Amino acid sequence: QPLVSLRGNLGKKDTMMYVHISNTLYLSSYNINEQTVGAYYKGIEKRSPQAIEGYPSSLYNLALLLKDKGLYCNIPVCFTSSENLLDFQRQLIEERFQTKIFDHYGTTERTIRISESIKHDGYFEDPGYSINEYLKDRVISTSLINSAFPLIRYQSSDVVILKENTKDERVFIDRIQGRSGNCIKGKDGSI
């Protein structure tokens, strides 16, 4: 299935790259601006992807530019990760890409992975990935997938908010606050 990836895979020199073996169109998250939005749109439309993955801020910035140009894409599924997904970002991304977002959370150290439920009513732990504890809304995790150098009781500075009441005991995380950061917009309009 064709995929579009809008993450940090490409540097500032490369705008886009198509990899046949994985059927993936990589778009640079560093070069999203008024000069590249047309090429990004054409690349997406040419491949009719079934899914798009990316940083929420990158997807949102591309969605803003698509909105300015009056353009829509039709991509059934969107996967976000690595940053907080804010409600206003979700709304515009889903509108402009005509998609449904499924958010994911994980650490660079690969000690935990949490995924948004199919009903969009919270998050669940990916089975078999880690053993997790939630103390004062902080995540403490032990990896079950890293046999070379497992991290035991690894604590990140990310924050999750647990659900007070849940009908499905597997979906017990209300939202992920994570950490917040800033984006800087360059003179050329790139993020």
Residue positions per predicted region:
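Conserved AMP-binding loop of ANL adenylate-forming enzymes
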Residues: 1-30
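Active-site glycine/GP-rich loop and adjacent strand/helix microenvironment
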Residues: 19-191
